[in-house]
Amino acid sequence: MQLETQDALYVALELAIAALSVAGNVLVCAAVGTSSALQTPTNYFLVSLAAADVAVGLFAIPFAITISLGFCTDFHSCLFLACFVLVLTQSSIFSLLAVAVDRYLAILVPLRYKSLVTGTRARGVIAVLWVLAFGIGLTPFLGWNSKDSATANCTEPRDGTTNESCCLVKCLFENVVPMSYMVYFNFFGCVLPPLLIMLAIYIKIFLVACRQLQRTELMDHSRTTLQREIHAAKSLAMIVGIFALCWLPVHAINCVTLFQPAQAKDKPKWAMNTAILLSHANSVVNPIVYAYRNRDFRETFHKIISRYVLCQTDVKSGNGQSGAQPVLSMGL
């Protein structure tokens, strides 16, 4: 009974996270789509991040709930359910990395930034990073999976034959995706290096920006612009930090499972469920950060919610002017 209650609580929390993730990130996409002030290359990368978070709510979380229940299905169907969230995670990491590089260029070469980073180039980068994310996330389909061990203990074949490709396996993540892939390839190879690169980039951004601010010959306009860039970098660094805090626990558990299998056998189910919930909750956080840190996003969110959710026809922006467009800013 305790397990059933725990599973019910897990499913309820996952569904709540899914609903909030979809609502918040659809709002982000709508804000960028409707506000010319928000249509910048930086925000295109944030839309890519939001799209991944919408997919987490619509697909990855339902898949995770399905896997947590351990139903029986054929091996490759289960493998797809398990790998889909890896695609979205990798896309999020690449989008965050692209934003970090974008902000680095804005600080390092401000005079050439607009010619280097255009909307067309940003959309091209987004297309490439999604292709890479699918390639990395679906790598287990190339053979790095647990098919041999999973099918060795499968239930009776679906068609009544002894063909192992038709047999049913208990669909649990660890039954189909080996921890060696999750730790060595996914975490050490595809998650940790980009996070460390982003850490180095943001440290460099703040060092360069602080040196420039200390220059007494800076014009007031240049100083104001630089301060806006620093504010944007702080907001984006906050998003990266929250991403790391939300995802590192589940990767830490994976490392323990691989390197200390004896101890991992006794790991409580609630610990893994909590780590998974925390990783999924990351998809809810970003719209809150945007609203808190950026006036353009905050005002556009207010206008969209007032007009399309509350059905108010006379929508006033944060400056009290009816229908006023958000003031253009340098970013978050």
Curated annotation (Swiss-Prot):
CC annotations in GO: plasma membrane
GO process annotations (BP): adenylate cyclase-activating G protein-coupled receptor signaling pathway; regulation of cell communication; regulation of signaling; vasodilation
Cysteine disulfide links: 78-171
Protein origin, superkingdom: Eukaryota
Pfam family, one: 7tm_1
Chain residues that bind adenosine: 174, 254, 279-280
Ranges in the topological domain labelled Cytoplasmic: 34-43, 102-121, 204-235, 292-332
Keyword Disulfide bond in annotation: yes
S-palmitoyl cysteine: lipidated positions: 311
Signal peptide: none
Family assignment from sequence similarity: Belongs to the G-protein coupled receptor 1 family.
Name under which the protein is recorded: Adenosine receptor A2b
Gene name in the database record: ADORA2B
